[in-house]
Amino acid sequence: VLIIEKADLELVLKHLHEWMKLSGYWFVVEDPVYSMEKIIFCQAKPVKTSRGWVMVRDFPLTLAKDSISLLPLKTEVHWKKWANDVGRCGIALTAGVPVLYSWYKALVRSGDGSFGAHPWSSRTGASYLASGLSGEEVAITDEARVSFWEAFGWSPYYQRLVEAELNGLTHDFSLGREGIQQHYNLIIPKENAKHFISNQLYNY
């Protein structure tokens, strides 16, 4: 990602390919963007929160990714440990971020205990991102809501609508033939139908 003055854009684009080729790189230049929230880096976008700019992983895809466990969850106790661990990691990553903050707090409410320093969890990208961060309560500001809207297309009204449902959500779990299954659906407004969240937690 290059962040430059708009006045320098033409000059940079004129010489960028040549400079990168001399450095041994071959790459594709995407169209320029003119706001921080439109930057995409490692499948994440910047969102301005009360604690500064936070790189927020691709939403709502991140909800599906964080609903998958690489650890065997054979009992309700295991599920609760997993839910608590994922939730606390997510809270550290998204404190002050609309929607996602409520999502991870729902996991913590549903969970209990911890797997601790497990080789799988300690080597994940989310674990590295959350390293050194704390999960203290952070207010979601109007500025954060507008910034999240710019980044992911969810208006403050819809953010609050989904958060109201998430804030009252506690996950239930059942052990089926394929392992622990969790079904949930959120009511997503028609305008955001392409982002409809309908997921299923599976552990094999």
Question: What are these regions, as identified by a protein language model?
Answer:
Residues 1-5:
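Short cationic amphipathic helices and targeting signals
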Residues 7-26, 31-204:
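Active-site and adjacent loop segments of nucleotide-processing enzymes
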